[in-house]
Amino acid sequence: QVPAVIYVCTKFLNELGNPWWFELWDFVKNKEAISLDNTFLKKEWITKTIFEKTICYSDIKSCLMTLSLSEQKLFFLDLTKSEKRKNYNHLFLDWDDVIELDKNPLITIGAHTHAHPILKMESYDSAYEEIENSKLLLEQKLGHYIEHFAYPFGSKNEVSFRDCEIVKKLNFKTAVTSLCHKPDINCMLRLPRYGLIETESLDNIAVKINGISNFLQRHLMI
């Protein structure tokens, strides 16, 4: 009987989303060498071992995290030599799933932008449209107001004060980041949140919940 908020990227529900982090790994893992020479990144990698593939993935991901949606599209066109993006619909909810979940009294549906951009890298108009469209689409489908929001990725590298102001303007009651800090009731549009991944162990989750991870980050700078 634990309540939960599920934050939804609406473009992924329409089977049009591109979770580039999955496609990037699928591309890298099947290559023994990768060379890039484009506007955004110029580098070569040997990718024969898992370790080498991981390094390459990390390098390219770091670059992609500094790009807008349109720039990411150009990057993948150069990387894969194809305009067609891979389909990962099986990994995500669809509209029927969201509508069914919304009926559960323990579940609250929140917005998470339309296409999961790096908001800080988008223009004001683009960021506003991304946040507003996800809210409006969910409200139209579910028949009620959407009051909660999660910033994509959510760190200070991806979210700016401008983005918080957009969320405020669109009348969200809460918004969560992936920052670690003491919650402030006067700052409900910049709430802290712990990020978890699929392979997270129970021990690692316990370390985050009891505050050890946050203590180490804030006081030991690691």
Task: Please describe what each predicted stretch is.
Residues 1-4, 19-20, 103-104, 114-117, ...:
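C-terminal active-site subregion of NodB/CE4 polysaccharide deacetylases
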Residues 13, 26-27, 31, 51, ...:
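A generic structural signal for solvent-exposed, polar alpha-helical segments
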